[in-house]
Curated annotation (Swiss-Prot):
Record's function text: Quinone reductase that provides resistance to thiol-specific stress caused by electrophilic quinones.
Alphabetical list of SUPFAM superfamilies matching this protein: Flavoproteins
Keyword Oxidoreductase: yes
Recorded family membership: Belongs to the azoreductase type 1 family.
Cofactor(s) of this protein: FMN
GO MF, any single term: oxidoreductase activity, acting on NAD(P)H as acceptor
Name of the molecule in the record: FMN-dependent NADH:quinone oxidoreductase
EC number(s) recorded for this UniProt protein: 1.6.5.-, 1.7.1.17
Reactions the enzyme catalyzes: 2 a quinone + NADH + H(+) = 2 a 1,4-benzosemiquinone + NAD(+); N,N-dimethyl-1,4-phenylenediamine + anthranilate + 2 NAD(+) = 2-(4-dimethylaminophenyl)diazenylbenzoate + 2 NADH + 2 H(+)
Residues the record lists as binding FMN: 9, 15-17, 138-141
Family annotation (InterPro entries): Flavodoxin_fold, Flavoprotein-like_sf, FMN-dep_NADH:Q_OxRdtase_AzoR1, NADH:quinone_OxRdtase_FMN_depd
PANTHER family reported in the protein's UniProt record: FMN-DEPENDENT NADH-AZOREDUCTASE 1, FMN-DEPENDENT NADH:QUINONE OXIDOREDUCTASE
Assembly, per entry: Homodimer.
Amino acid sequence: MQVLHIDSSITGAASVSRQLTAQTVAALVAANPGAKVEYLDLAVNAPDHLNAVSMGFRTGQAATTEAERAQNAISEALVSQFLAADVVVVGAPFYNFTISSQLKAWIDRIAQGGRTFRYTAAGPEGLAKGKKVIVASTRGGVYSTSEMGQALEHQESYLKTVFGFLGITDVSIVRAEGVAMGDESKAKALESARSDIVRAAAAANQEAAIAA
């Protein structure tokens, strides 16, 4: 099993999503001692947001400058790392109703025509099939239990849409919400998330056993 462990929280040791991704990866490795884990901390080493220099892979134009070649190499490294993974564990804190800009920058680098998706006469087709994604979703408030909250949520739904577009339909959510609503609320959120981790890791381990 090849695991790609991604964190994107900017709060360091205080991050709940980092705590949950670490616990998720630990559960995967405990059941698969031979698992290989690659770690990507987007708060420390995020790719630049796309611009005229870094979007060569989208236009198909060959790099003509050192800056363009350097940006193309970053995009290639990130998409190759993603495609090599069997399981992707993503820490996705809820910032202003959506994901962090660092995580969005990573998505923009791996969403590559001809690599992770393609357009066909029948419509778009994802090319990253067969992977499992586990999203550690953390929120200061509670958004999943009301119609108003769900209307404001563009985090989990966005990630499911993006990964689905890339061909990944096996997306599990490890959710801790209400973590900024007092100690009792945070404790309940973490307890619920730990149950999510057990279920998500068990499903991934079962799929790995079948594949083996």
